[in-house]
Amino acid sequence: MSARTPGRRRVALVHDWLTGMRGGERVLERVARFFPDADLHTLVWTPGAVSRELERHRIRTSFLNRLPAADTHYRWFLPLFPAAIESLDLSGYDAVVSTSHAVAKGVITRPGVPHVSIVFTPMRYVWDLQGQYFPPGRFQWPVSAYVEHVCARLRRWDRATASRPTTIVAISRYVGDRIRRHWGRESTVVFPHVDVERFTPGTGERSYYLLAGAFAPYKRLDLALQAFRGLDLPLVVVGGGQEESRLHALAPRGTEFRSGVSDAELARIYAGAKALLFPGEEDFGIMPLEAMASGTPVIAFGRGGAVETVGRGASDEALATVEAGGIARVPGGMLFGTQTASAVASAVRAFERETFDPHTLASLAQPFSGERFDAEIRAVFEEAGVLEAGA
């Protein structure tokens, strides 16, 4: 085990899997700066898939990492996730910090060891979004019965192991509500950070709408593509993933797809967009804040984290309109209250009649800076006993 920095406890970091550098991994990267000597435990690791900063830590993997195709098809091993996370040996550590959207919060620690779990979401594919990940008719019997059995077993495990962390941090009030509903536990809300200094409001022409993110079912990018089939407006789509072929088939003629873009290129794309489309119900959502930091308004579904970012500071009247299924202008752009393609199209048409000041939008992203995150999460770590005061 690596040596400790004086004044710091021997800390283990735990993350579900290290197969790409997405929002959760950026939070992990920021958290890891508090614990430069910590070992990093995970179910599966693809070398080179995450930042050099994370890979400077000693990375320890579960038995899943030795299975064929685990680095690319780890989701096939969903029934084994609980056993894999519980197999990680954390007996030699004084404190544990997990960043969890699946099973990381369920690691087993020694009695009395403080464990802070930063929770991005309870397992969405066995709770709220099971119907989207495993829709009726996707599998024939007996596979369908087996899938339901696995999901039910994972729900029981997920709730039972919610008592393992000594402190739970939710990344939004929306996630905190779901933690309370599914796990019966309270949490402290600390919003994730956005590297706002990477983005500046664009001063040039804004000529296209932007749709960006992982091509996953719960993102509902399909709704925006269907909406734009009836809108004569330019659309740029950035990202990739499991739904790539389906989304290409849905896209209207003239849609521009881009993949593998760098952080610098994405910042330029944000700055040239008329608006970012955000049709999914997200636990928090970093991309809307990145867009706003670029002076770009957001057209978002008015549920989940978008209400706390795009809708931050909105009037009660506007939020009530969205809650009732309508469309309303809010400080960060537009919110629509029905998750349908027609609602996206209506919101875009309403947006076309509005104007937004890029610098005002950029100022709305400033409270989500890294410095704010550092101060708030440090206070949690110190109170929980995973970080000594002043260390």
Model-derived segments and their meaning:
Residues 34-105:
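Active-site donor-binding segments of glycosyltransferases and PAPS-dependent sulfotransferases
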Residues 312-341, 350-355:
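Conserved acidic donor-binding segment of nucleotide-sugar-dependent glycosyltransferases
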Residues 245-267:
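Nucleotide-activated donor-binding/catalytic signature segment of Leloir-type glycosyltransferases, i.e.
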Residues 135-168, 176:
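Membrane-proximal helix-turn-helix segments that form the acceptor-binding/catalytic region
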Residues 271-283, 296-297:
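Acidic donor-binding loop of glycosyltransferase active sites
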Residues 297-301, 307-310, 317-319:
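Short hydrophobic beta-strand element within catalytic cores of glycosyltransferases
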Residues 339-342, 346-382:
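A charged, aromatic-enriched C-terminal amphipathic alpha-helix characteristic of glycosyltransferases
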Residues 196, 200-236:
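Conserved donor-binding/catalytic core segment of Leloir-type glycosyltransferases
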